[in-house]
Curated annotation (Swiss-Prot):
Protein name, entry field: 32 kDa beta-galactoside-binding lectin
Primary localization class, coarse: membrane
Organism of provenance: Haemonchus contortus
Keyword ATP-binding: no
Gene name as annotated: GAL-1
CDD domains in the cross-refs: GLECT
Amino acid sequence: MVSQFLHWYEYNKPVPYRSLLQEKIEPGQTLIVKGSTIDESQRFTINLHSKSADFSGNDVPLHISVRFDEGKVVMNTFANGEWGKEERKSLPIKKGDSFDIRIRAHDDRFQIVIDQKEFKDYEHRLPLTSITHLSIDGDLYLNHVHWGGKYYPVPYESGIASGFPIDKTLLIFGTVEKKAKRFNINLLRRNGDIALHFNPRFDEKAVIRNALAANEWGNEEREGKMPFEKGVGFDLAIKNEAYAFQIFVNGERFTSFAHRQDPNDISGLQIQGDIELTGIQIQ
């Protein structure tokens, strides 16, 4: 069944921010931090801690320091009372801009993504299981934080235990493969019909929307620019409303698709093609 993506999701948080993780971080899970800066911003940090959300001497498996004053992002680990060797990269964020930083845990490394683009792989220097707390501090406005997800197979198919009735939203977090040609997302009816076929085609530079009823496809809809990029992450939201699905890509409305059958008769999800999935949620 479609699993809950989020272990927590918090909006407009005060800074400094401190949080105890309710569960151990598992490989495949992603921490998403979204916020904004001001023209006077100098630095801010994101830290994954062991035992306490401070720098009182306990280990810090991952320290990310965004330094506008140096034009760098500095990554490091504090272990056994000492800082290790810094890893530095040029800063892709400008002062005054909003930002989206994602940290995905793997068995051997953290995969760091900034504004939906690959930024840095940081090899673990301490066990992933030692992480218990998160802190965020510095010159930023923290809009929201969430953490969850897992490894998903593609093709992916799942039932939706609670259904997908009107007023619910399906969120899909993923990354388009660098050599992608196509991917598709299907919302399935109980009888096997497809209520919504959402099919970005890079080879045609179009996003096809359609529905399948009694083994026959209806009329294709393909208006609108391609909102996805090869090799770049995306957040896709599909909201089931009374007369149509409203579809958003990266927080911006992309299109609507008028229902062609009962909007309350959706019981399954299929995802296929040239993408990597990082999270699926219905809210």
